[in-house]
Curated annotation (Swiss-Prot):
UniProt function note: Catalytic component of the NuA4 histone acetyltransferase (HAT) complex which is involved in epigenetic transcriptional activation of selected genes principally by acetylation of nucleosomal histones H4, H3, H2B, H2A and H2A variant H2A.Z. Acetylates histone H4 to form H4K5ac, H4K8ac, H4K12ac and H4K16ac, histone H3 to form H3K14ac, and histone H2A to form H2AK4ac and H2AK7ac. The NuA4 complex is involved in the DNA damage response and is required for chromosome segregation. The NuA4 complex plays a direct role in repair of DNA double-strand breaks (DSBs) through homologous recombination.
Residue positions where N6-acetyllysine is found in the record: K296
Main location: nucleus
GN (gene name): ESA1
Protein name, entry field: Histone acetyltransferase ESA1
Entries under Gene3D superfamilies matching the protein: 2.30.30.140, 3.40.630.30, N-acetyl transferase-like, Winged helix-like DNA-binding domain superfamily/Winged helix DNA-binding domain
Amino acid sequence: MAVAEIKKEKGSSLSPEPSSPIQILSTEPDANTDIKQEKFTPKDILPGCKVHVSKDGEFRLAEILQEHIKKGRKVFYVHYQDFNKRLDEWIELDRIDFTRSLILPEIKADTKENKSKKKSKSKGQTKLSKNNTTANSTTGTPQPSDGQPIMGDDEMDLENLNVQGLKRPGEEFSREDEIKKLRTSGSMTQNHSEVARVRNLSTIILGEHIIEPWYFSPYPIELTEEDEIYICDFTLSYFGSKKQFERFRSKCSMKHPPGNEIYRDSKVSFWEIDGRKQRTWCRNLCLLSKLFLDHKTLYYDVDPFLFYIMTIKSDQGHHVVGYFSKEKESADGYNVACILTLPCYQKRGFGKLLIQFSYMLTKVERKVGSPEKPLSDLGLLSYRAYWTDTLVKLLVERNSPALFRKNNSQLEYDEAENGKDSSATPTPGPGSNASQSSILASAAASRSGLNSSPIFSNEITIEDISSITCMTTTDILHTLTTLQMLRYYKGQHIIVLTDQIMELYEKLVKKVKEKKKHELNPKLLHWTPPSFTANQLRFGW
């Protein structure tokens, strides 16, 4: 028999609250029956509180960030403690454990010490600003210092750095202030409210893939009330109902991104799209990518950017796998502004292909490049993996011609033998010291997207590595230091190829031989670096 647990207390009613859960028992309760008592009600839940929420079969402590009424149901947006922000989600009441204690937010009272620190800090900042003003107005006159270092334009105050981008108590930011905080390139988020906003879409259906978004994206507000959003994987148009989507697809004839196909091999294709010429498509792409990138902003339009889209082909057409964008004119020498592999295609090597292609374009431009900072956590991992593979392969094979000849394909050897790469590497004439290995190295370097004519030697400079790989010296030094390859020995710097480095090289070669790692072929690239006039680079032209 099922009964409801009823306790008669002073001032309490025998009738339960309509919104309160009632425990159901299969037998009559007795003294030994363990009855779970509710310690709070839904009315007690406020933003900032912490509750235990059912997640993947167990209860996890989560912080309530926001509450909302969606289609007549009360839902809460929660952040799981000690978990990545991309796991934040909307939950309903049935996933909350009301038998465990509700943890209220801590209220930090301003003590006398805190108040005195704030006052002294504000005085120091005022004094510093006065010194800066005087220094700027008077040239050649030294000014007294208060002992605090004055930071340059490229330095960060690590003590006061707001890492999460959340608005601190007492801080107010207008839209104009937020725009002023943006970098001049327009692709980084430094505004506070953008990062702090909660995820607004529950599920998107992209072609045949059902994807759960990670972050907020400014889609139309009417779509946020829908449980599922349908996105066309060719036009990237979005719809709130399946009927609208199917009607659109029955009339849509687009089968690939609206740009020029500049690369195609047996696995992937790349398309170049000008943001000014295809504004709608590129804006839809930015809205989609913002669902999976937390550190980007959409304040600026797409006109100043070129988009390079990677696709795979099926019977239906070319499906977007990922993309990267780059500024038409980058004052800082960045070759990538934003890069993303869609979650349904991640962990399949496509991220490294995007990175390799960006450096392939940089090589054609005869430049060195680096991605715009800061990178996302997944983006940083992908770049570190690419930089590691590139440097390990280059340094090991440069130091050992035997390994180079052993681990490069017979096709490259035949091309070098037959002179098919004579346009890139002139054939040595009589009396030349160039060996057959040098010709082979040139062919393989051209195929891998590196500069031609590598020399087999146990000496190399950082600038040489930069010219071969098109990586910046900063990225090279960062990677060598991370791998613990760069040492200081007897008054000079050396690069040490340890056993761990050789193991990395063998794993890399094994992946290529087993065709687990796809390599792009620069010979299949048909692309000329675009040039723009001053008027074309002007925003809003």
